[in-house]
């Protein structure tokens, strides 16, 4: 009897973990989609642009920098400042084109 109760609790815990995991995953995906409507099918571009913000955050260690860089699907002034700080200004035309693709549908 005790073994059956323990099994029941184990099964319930597994289901709880699965449900919470799915909810968190869907919320994260929804945030990325709302912030950058063109990200679907363009994950590689999104990764390249996101990398600039992550590198900038790693240099300055300020969460406001990371949030500001990503704001408006990378259309913020902070993103340009991060490109400058990462010494990637010569790549700005490429990033501008990629950000335009990620912002498609706005």
Curated annotation (Swiss-Prot):
Propeptide segment residues: 105-106
Tissue-level expression: Sinus gland of the eyestalk.
Gene Ontology, cellular component aspect: extracellular region
Superkingdom per UniProt: Eukaryota
Main localization, broad class: secreted
Sorted UniProt keywords: Amidation, Disulfide bond, Hormone, Neuropeptide, Secreted, Signal
Disulfide bonds: 36-73, 53-69, 56-82
SUPFAM superfamilies on file: Crustacean CHH/MIH/GIH neurohormone
Known role: Inhibits Y-organs where molting hormone (ecdysteroid) is secreted. A molting cycle is initiated when MIH secretion diminishes or stops.
Family per record: Belongs to the arthropod CHH/MIH/GIH/VIH hormone family.
Annotated protein name in UniProt: Molt-inhibiting hormone
Gene source species: Faxonius limosus (Spinycheek crayfish)
């Amino acid at each position: 009897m005790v073994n059956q109760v323990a099994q029941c609790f184990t099964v319930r815990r597994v289901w709880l973990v699965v449900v919470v995991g799915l909810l968190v995953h869907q919320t994260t995906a929804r945030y990325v989609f709302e912030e950058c409507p063109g990200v679907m099918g363009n994950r590689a571009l999104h990764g390249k642009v996101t990398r600039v913000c992550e590198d900038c955050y790693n240099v300055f260690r300020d969460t406001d920098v990371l949030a500001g860089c990503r704001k408006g699907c990378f259309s913020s002034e902070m993103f340009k400042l991060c490109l400058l700080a990462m010494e990637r200004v010569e790549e700005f035309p490429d990033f501008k084109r990629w950000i335009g693709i990620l912002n498609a549908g706005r």
